[in-house]
Structures are given as structure tokens and as C-alpha cells.
Amino acid sequence: MEREVTVVNKLGLHARPAAEFVRCARQFESSVVIRKGGESFSAASILDVLSASLDCGASMVLDADGPDAEEALEKLTALLAKFKIQEES
């Protein structure tokens, strides 16, 4: 199961939001992978997420595989949107 998303936080997915994203990804039994520019990165690895260079406007595909894949994609997508709301506060 996959979902295409765009990073909307004007600072991108830098250290603090990346750490929150990884914590969220780790709470699921499903494996979640970020695909961007022909490369794949584990959503459960802070080094992978930071290495993905997820700047503002970056488009990526979240690919989840496992029993709670749909829930994982919902929560991670909502979290990415929340970063935009926090930025505006």
C-alpha cells in the first residue's frame, strides 16, 4: 500500500520533525519505506530519513507493508500535515 505525499513544512523534514516522524513509524508492525528520486529509505531510521533530503516541496512515496499498513500511512500523512500547522502557529 502506498501514498504520495509532499513535504509542506517550509524548513523541510529537519532533525526535530524527522525524529517525530521516525518515532511514529516505529510504532507500527508494518514496514514503512520512503521512496524518493529512485532511492528507498527506511521510515524507522533517523539516518535514512535525514539522508532522504526531504526539503519543503519534496515529493515522496510512503510505501507500507504489513497488517497495519493503512493505519501507518494515515498517521504518517497526518503527522506531515501537522508539521505545517505547527509552523504556522
Give the label of every model feature segment.
Residues 1-2:
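Absolute protein N-terminus
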Residues 6-52, 56:
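Compact, glycine-rich, soluble single-domain proteins
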Residues 53-89:
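C-terminal structural segments of small proteins and small subunits
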